[in-house]
């Protein structure tokens, strides 16, 4: 391994003159060095999970499960079962998160267990499609609910929607670049806001039940089918329910910034996912106290229709709640996706500048700018919804691959420290459930799934050219070094130190012995920037 890559984890960065780096003491997590801060406590950790799971779906279109389940009772069962399966998957990720205590989530786990190519493909599909498209869609939903009251008789102009979505992305990127604490406070506030809005829906549902409005909750009516029962549609209902819980694994992307991750990672999971399951189930119960299944399926914004029926002049609360929920969702996604790209760059799978952090704010500014720019590019395309359909299958495929990796790790390395060790029955249950859903997805939409696989496999030549090929032309290396140096000076960023004795340090050293990074700076660049006077 060349010295340049080793320098990434060098914790003794000095000035050219031989003195220590002048990064402020508060910047690092220890010893005055520049490092990611451990600022995410239990409350903020719960906010990240809840805020990323609960987006606009439960307010706007929870009807996907009901439409395919065929009855209210079966739909509620689907919500409960998918919540339970999500808890099982989260328990598997909790064990992996404390066994491999690195940011990057399933990307880091897949890479460490199955090798660089498998990890790169997970990162490739996330960088290329998943995060940019999802963030663009959430931002567009936010702008739609903000602008719709200004255009009561028509749809808001498309250009206005995209402009406001871009402003939302730029504002939240600035917040995340400025301070981890600001970003987590924004997440906490907007998560609390969406939970209060859902609590209002649930309370109104309880009031409706007390008034005797529970026709569709009586067993004889709850299981009355409004369409012919079909096992394929029931499977699709489970798939829709699983999509609604998407984001449950996002806390694993920021493991290194958690305060006491060995305790707070599992605690946040145990608190957040049962809470989300409770909210999802009882919000749907509340909806059917005010609307029949047919009315619910006909509504384009279920919570808004619910509010119009029960809130009267206060019905405006619901669209505002959707807007607040999506705003918080964009913030949470920017926060976690930037850490994924940061982790990928640190492993040598993305340009190395993305693995740098600001010398005083200790935020991964290059990674945040990267995810923001890629999302803005998606905003100007017209095919992002199609792309989401294509790669949704791949995203959930990697959930199964990651959990399978837990079993492989138990077999290959049975003696490594595991602060949390769950029964192997849990990953087996999870894998059986996901095998059923993935096989059904392949059977029902083979073309869509095939295109998704093809998009993922475009990463194979990129991996061999960018990562595996070690002896690149000197002109290419010189250009990348120049680009890295310019980016460092523009963003005032350096490589972070790695805390001694952490699992991250050992994992990075193992990585360096096994593979060459995609882009590799020389050691002097970091020192040059560290020696610059800071603004």
UniProtKB/Swiss-Prot annotation:
Stated consequence of mutating residue 243 to A: Abolishes leucine and tryptophan transport activities
Q: Where is this region: Disordered?
A: 1-30, 502-535
- Which gene carries the instructions for this protein? SLC7A8
Q: What is the effect of changing residue 460 to E?
A: Found in a patient with age-related hearing loss; strongly decreases L-alanine transport activity. Decreases L-tyrosine transport activity. Decreases cell membrane localization
The UniProt-reported impact of residue 396 to A is: Strongly reduces L-leucine uptake activity
Primary localization:
membrane
Activity regulation information from UniProt: Inhibited by the L-type inhibitor 2-Aminobicyclo-(2,2,1)-heptane-2-carboxylic acid (BCH).
Q: Show the taxonomic lineage.
A: Eukaryota, Metazoa, Chordata, Craniata, Vertebrata
What protein name is recorded for this chain?
Answer: Large neutral amino acids transporter small subunit 2
Q: What does this protein do?
A: Associates with SLC3A2 to form a functional heterodimeric complex that translocates small and large neutral amino acids with broad specificity and a stoichiometry of 1:1. Functions as amino acid antiporter mediating the influx of extracellular essential amino acids mainly in exchange with the efflux of highly concentrated intracellular amino acids. Has relatively symmetrical selectivities but strongly asymmetrical substrate affinities at both the intracellular and extracellular sides of the transporter.
- Bias (Basic and acidic residues): 1-17
* Stretches in topological domain Cytoplasmic: 1-44, 96-116, 179-181, 253-265, 339-364, 409-423, 467-535
Q: Could you tell me which species this protein originates from?
A: Homo sapiens
Residues marked Important for substrate specificity (site): 134, 246
Offer a single GO CC term for the protein.
basolateral plasma membrane
**What kind of membrane protein is this, topologically?**
Multi-pass membrane protein
Q: Which residues cross the membrane?
A: 45-65, 74-95, 117-149, 158-178, 182-210, 231-252, 266-287, 313-338, 365-382, 387-408, 424-446, 447-466
């Amino acid at each position: 391994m060349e010295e340049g890559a080793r320098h990434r984890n060098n914790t003794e960065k000095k000035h050219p003159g031989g003195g220590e780096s002048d990064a402020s003491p508060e910047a690092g997590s220890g010893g005055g060095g520049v490092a990611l801060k451990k600022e995410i406590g239990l409350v903020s950790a719960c906010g990240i999970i809840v805020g990323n799971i609960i987006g606009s779906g439960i307010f706007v279109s929870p009807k996907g499960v009901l439409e395919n389940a065929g009855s209210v009772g079966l739909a509620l069962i689907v919500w409960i079962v998918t919540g339970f399966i999500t808890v099982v998957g989260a328990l598997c990720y909790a064990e992996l998160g404390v066994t491999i205590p690195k940011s990057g989530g399933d990307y880091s786990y897949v890479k460490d267990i199955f090798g660089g190519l498998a990890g790169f493909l997970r990162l490739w599909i996330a960088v290329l499609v998943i995060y940019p498209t999802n963030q663009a869609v959430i931002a567009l939903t936010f702008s739609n609910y903000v602008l719709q009251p200004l255009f009561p008789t028509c749809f808001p102009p498309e250009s206005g929607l995209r402009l406001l979505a871009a402003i939302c992305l730029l504002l939240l990127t600035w917040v995340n670049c400025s301070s981890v604490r600001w970003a987590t406070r924004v997440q906490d506030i907007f998560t609390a806001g969406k939970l209060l809005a859902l609590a209002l829906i649930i309370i109104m549902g309880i009031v409706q039940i007390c008034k005797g409005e529970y026709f569709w909750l009586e067993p004889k009516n709850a299981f009355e089918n409004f369409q012919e029962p079909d096992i394929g549609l029931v499977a699709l209902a489970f798939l829709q329910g699983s999509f609604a819980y998407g984001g449950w694994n996002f806390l694993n992307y920021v493991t290194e910034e958690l305060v006491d991750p060995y305790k707070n990672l599992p605690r946040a999971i145990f608190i957040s996912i049962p809470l989300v399951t409770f909210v999802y189930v009882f919000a749907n119960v509340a909806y059917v106290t005010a609307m029949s299944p047919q009315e619910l399926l006909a509504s384009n914004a279920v919570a808004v229709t619910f509010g119009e029926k029960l809130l009267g002049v206060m019905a405006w609360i619901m669209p505002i709640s959707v807007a607040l929920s999506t705003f918080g969702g964009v913030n949470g996604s920017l926060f976690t996706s930037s850490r994924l790209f940061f982790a990928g760059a640190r492993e040598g799978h993305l340009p190395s500048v993305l693995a740098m952090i600001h010398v005083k704010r200790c935020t991964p500014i290059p990674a945040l700018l990267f995810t923001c720019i890629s999302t803005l590019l998606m905003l100007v395309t017209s095919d992002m919804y199609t792309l989401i359909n294509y790669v949704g299958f791949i995203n959930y495929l990697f959930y199964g691959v990651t959990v399978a990796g837990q079993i492989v790790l138990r077999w290959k390395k049975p003696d490594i420290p595991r602060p949390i060790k769950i029964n192997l029955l849990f990953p087996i249950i999870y894998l059986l459930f996901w095998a059923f859903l993935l096989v059904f997805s392949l059977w029902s939409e083979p073309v869509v799934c095939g295109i998704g696989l093809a998009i993922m496999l475009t990463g194979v030549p990129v991996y061999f050219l960018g990562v595996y090929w070690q002896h690149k032309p000197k002109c290419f290396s010189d250009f990348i070094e120049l680009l890295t140096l310019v980016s460092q000076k523009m963003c005032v960023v350096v490589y972070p130190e790695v805390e001694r004795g952490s699992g991250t340090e050992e994992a990075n050293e193992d990585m360096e012995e096994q593979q060459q990074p995609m882009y590799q700076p020389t050691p002097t660049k970091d020192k040059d920037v560290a020696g610059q006077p800071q603004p």
